[in-house]
Amino acid sequence: MRIGFDHEKYLEEQSKYILERVNNYDKLYLEFGGKLLFDLHAKRVLPGFDENAKIKLLHKLKEKVEIIICLYAGDIERNKIRGDFGITYDVDVLRLIDDLRGYDLEVNSVVITRYSGQPATNIFINKLERRGIKVYKHEATKGYPTDVDTIVSDEGYGKNPYIETTKPIVVVTAPGPGSGKLATCLSQLYHEYKRGNVAGYSKFETFPVWNVPLKHPLNIAYESATVDLKDVNMIDSFHFDAYNKVAVNYNRDIESFPVLKRIIEKITGEESVYKSPTDMGVNRVGFGIVDDEVVKEASKQEIIRRAFKTACEYKKGYVDKETFHRAKLIMEEMNLKEEDRKVVIPAREYAAKLKERANKSETCTVVALELEDGTILTGRSSELMDGTAAVILNAVKHYANISDEIHLISPVILEPIINLKAKTLGSKRTALSCEEVLIALSICAATNPTAQVAMGRLPMLKGCQAHSTTILSTNEEQTFRKLGIDVTCDPEYISESLYYNN
């Protein structure tokens, strides 16, 4: 893989800049946008970026940092899903707490925002409290977003309970956008000043990258990733007016800046040190780019990937038609097409060939996989196994120089598994999934040296690209994710079944 980003340089620059910012205050509330862990988007568009860079940064500052996690009550009620992991936001909070503790980071509490006694939210609160985790409930702020006098009063932020913190940097994070991070930071700022403490607010958001051109593919890829939020990158006019320098930000931050500035000035009783939304940020990711061409190409591929993802989400009913069309439009505006993703054409051509040979109405899933050396392999679904499993077996055979004719998994192992699924468990779909095939392969590896060699090649699939001609089940997507394979799908179901497709 060609590297476009210097991870070590970025970590050094970023930690230094955060510490410089905290020196101005007794306490700094740092709003962390994007993903704190497993930032797969950043990893894809910035080759060389560590997906856990942010948490490693916090680990470096662990003596000075504690963490508050925000979760919007409405997201619990509607079971909002974190797309890259296929888990709900409330479950992601539990995962996040475990992961933060694994990095020796102190989790202060969980804040439920815009709380109004929702039943599912109460169950989640009970679950946390009974495991010894502090939970604070913040209701919707009266007067927000325009009535600053009410917002900054005992009727507004004053109604929220004060969260007791002890360290100079308080990181406020969440599973996703719209979780109430900013409101929590400002509420805390209000309470700090009421107590006579000098506190500050800053924002750490990786994208858009403020010191990269507006129409750079890296920033356009961010628009594509947030197409459901309708985010649009813009030139920060406040920054240009104050410093005569061009900086990129996004519409929500620019639109809310005048009110945000007034709220901060009302809380502190003095003029804000921030002249623009860009001033509020502490992001230094742009300084880690070492090969712009590599980043551009990776970002273009991400735009195509996002268009596929949005098309599938539209088919599943998760997003509206406007979001679907916008993702496609962003791709077309960059003069990109679906076929610019190398694995798309081989998958579609093989699927078309199979359809010609078989019943015209039958749909067969074909998965194409591009290896690091540029080789493209395919696998098809059959009565025995899914297309995902077939292509993985083909890939490990390729890496281990094992002939196609050699069976890696003994029928003695496969038949009892299929019988178990069909007869004992009564499953309608008896074809083995990718995960089931990998488990079967690992059993065979105990007695078959060839299978053992093939198993040893699985880590080589990390970073590979794949495309499926039909929508994959959540389970198949997660298996590919665990293997480190980026997969896209055509927005077609394998059958007309409504339930058994998944």
Swiss-Prot record:
Pfam families: DUF1846, DUF1846_C. It comes from the Bacteria. InterPro entries: DUF1846 (IPR014999), DUF1846_C (IPR048441), DUF1846_N (IPR048496). HAMAP family: UPF0371 (MF_01567). Belongs to the UPF0371 family. This is UPF0371 protein CLJ_B0384. It comes from Clostridium botulinum (strain 657 / Type Ba4).
